[in-house]
Amino acid sequence: MQDKYLPSAVEQAAQQHWQAIDAYRVPEHATGPDGKEKPKFYACSMLPYPSGKLHMGHVRNYTINDVMARYLRMNGNNVLMPMGWDAFGMPAENAALNNGVAPAAWTYDNIAYMKKQMQSMGLAIDWSREVATCSPDYYRWNQWLFLKMLEKGIAYRKTGTVNWDPVDQTVLANEQVIDGRGWRSGAIVEKREIPMYYLRITDYAEELLGDLDGLGWPERVKIMQQNWIGKSVGVRFAFKHDIEGDDGQLINDGKLYVFTTRADTIMGVTFCAVAAEHPLATHAAANNPELAAFIDECKHGSVMEADMATMEKKGMPTGLQVTHPLTGEQVDVWVGNYVLMSYGDGAVMGVPAHDERDFAFANKYKLPIRQVIDVKGQPYSTEAWQEWYGDKENGVCIESGKYNGLGYLAAVEAIAADLGAMGLGEKKITWRLRDWGISRQRYWGTPIPLIHCDSCGVVPVPEQDLPVVLPEDLVPDGTGNPLNKDPRFLQCSCPSCGKPARRETDTMDTFIDSCWYYMRYTCPDAATMVDARNDYWMPMDQYIGGIEHAILHLLYARFWTKVMRDLGLVKFDEPFTNLLTQGMVLNETFYREDAAGKKTWYNPADVDVQTDDRGRPVGATLKADGQPVVIGGVEKMSKSKNNGIDPQALIDQHGADTARLFVMFAAPPEQQLEWSGSGVEGASRFLRRVWNYGFANAAAVRDGAGAAPTADDADLRREIHGVLKQANYDYQRIQYNTVVSATMKMLNALEDAKNASPVARRECFGILLRVLYPVVPHITHGLWDALGYATQYGDLLDAPWPQVDEGALVRTEIEMVLQINGKVRGSVTVPADADRAAIETAAAASETVAKFAEGKAPKKIVVVPGRLVNVVL
């Protein structure tokens, strides 16, 4: 055993050992030493995109998973911790454009490097189950299930709106549109309607909403999904009109439909707004160039809901009017840039008195504001919006004719009934959730397995011809999808008639790849999409990932699972029983700003920080030139702010165990973690102390095998077993920061117990090593072997978890505070089971009392059991 802790040597030796014994290959239905089948536990981190290098967020995520897996394995579980790569997507195409390499080559190189980094972290990953979503063996099942959905009507084709770059001749993602222009060409982006494929996720909306209740997920994630699914109970009704189209027929049968959850405010409607693509807008713009220009502007805007919520609300009158169904009044129709044709009927009613958005819109364009809801004692003013204007809990109808005095529920019921009797409306449930458009006009993704034939139309690729393999040698040049220009891929024969035909060149949304990879981990070599091994492991017991995936990935994975269930492929309703969303890793930011307002960000490693007496930063200078930089505050580590820490550099300098220990100790897993260089140094010092204790006490620890502890060891054993009890609790509730704190207390106790017997040192240090092992497996493995524990208990991987000795926690004596005339003067030691009389006797006989009593007998002795004794003289 080396006297000095050398992380690189210790970690290399441990990793070579684990590799030699294939330590992390996990079978199904494993049995324990007693011959009984172990309970399974499937713990999985969200698979990474192979961007090139791990970042500290990866390190934290995977270490949380690894700690959990190792702890559960030592406690008798059959634990699966797999890993794979979310390998399709736009970043690979962008890298290809920048570097002139095929996305496939870039992706596979990155996978190889990142896998090597993960292995250097000592993660307990079963690499025999590795999956890359860009592998034809994987994405063939994306294609297969898509065809099954097509057969069942779950997948269908319709036109959808996309961002079109007319210069690069390509479709852009929303994030590639910057101020209305293409990110690469700078061309003004157009909105185009093109045929796309959709999945009917809305058919599962009710189940997706209801099943959230049974999941062990953070409440805020459930709420985010609930809001995204967006169940609304309201009334859909029509404003009638007599507006005719060019064909002489009434547009939309003379009805403008809207949906509202606030039917009680219907008498306050002063305008209606329609989407730019609405037939009434198109009709009105035919002879109105100004309106046509505004509609064109709307069509060039974003269709993302997040953007719609924050952008300036604009509108223009159409000159058209519709008839209010209950009052008969004429209501002006406007085109609004905030109304989407893809949502509901592409039209909304405007009630500015009781809707904040409508209130702002009406004030901007000087539209009437009519109050029809009153909350007692609240004066109404059109000058500024007040929260009570939209209050449906306490408001009652006013200025609403027969509905006056009705509260929200009663008014909605009465108005819905009247509209229904007129044949103009009905109560209805609507959903914010929309069907999932999966077509992407991009190259690096799963090919959609369809063929276009001039004679037969759209024809599915026969199952025996799957997978439709994506050519991996294409290099995008930014001018459209390269699949459209590759005859090897494009040209084929129609499976139905045999005539020349063309393959579909759209690829699938990459969220499809991440919908079910965790199932393929369970059976990566299966000849079918999944097999019986998936039934054994799924549903997953613990999923770990960032809060940024709370909606789309998790929602799509839940939907995909339910489709697989309905197709008879799986036997469960939900894929992830429990979810942990780890907090972000933060770091300081520093920058300089030029005259034009452009900021240049500097990495914290390149900056010297000046602090005050309390350690608070008061200034900073760049090391390169000594000139000041601005302290930008603490933010999430990111490339854009240049405040990341390279995990590989950290591992090279301090070792993987130090990196693991710091990210586990610095904060609870679900909370944000603020980077601290001094914290890393502290973690490194602690590990050196652990090693030094093992080296200094090696002979005693080895000699302590087989003997029994002595009475003199009681204090040490009581401390260690008490801390062990708390550590067990903290492991179970995934509070790994306090687990690390527990091991620090254990080490302090061991170092302080100078006279402990060899047997106590062996027992207590062995407990420390096992409790610490899931967090820092390399150093603990090295000490475990060097000190002879492996001979007694076997490999630390599967060593039995230490059991709390309840007997060791029992105190034979307790120390009570001693007061004299109400003032603390010392303490008195009494047997733990001493009664009141015995405590009084011990206190009266103490030297401290004798000193203050000066021969006088106590007047009274007050005992607070277990805490203090007060002697009144």
Curated annotation (Swiss-Prot):
Q: Which UniProt keywords apply?
A: Aminoacyl-tRNA synthetase, ATP-binding, Cytoplasm, Ligase, Nucleotide-binding, Protein biosynthesis
Q: What is a GO molecular function of this protein? A: ATP binding
Keyword Aminoacyl-tRNA synthetase set for record: yes
Where does motif 'KMSKS' region map?
636-640
Please indicate the residue ranges that the annotation assigns to the motif 'HIGH' region: 48-58
- What Gene Ontology terms describe where this protein resides (cellular component)? cytosol
Q: Which domain of life does this protein belong to?
A: Bacteria
- Kindly give the InterPro entries that the UniProt entry links to this protein: aa-tRNA-synth_I_CS, aa-tRNA-synth_Ia, Leu-tRNA-ligase, Leu_tRNA-synth_edit, M/V/L/I-tRNA-synth_anticd-bd, Rossmann-like_a/b/a_fold, tRNAsynth_Ia_anticodon-bd, Val/Leu/Ile-tRNA-synth_edit
Enzyme Commission no: 6.1.1.4
- Which enzyme class, named as a word? ligase
Q: Tell me a GO biological process for this protein.
A: leucyl-tRNA aminoacylation
Q: Which family does it belong to?
A: Belongs to the class-I aminoacyl-tRNA synthetase family.
**Protein name per the record:** Leucine--tRNA ligase
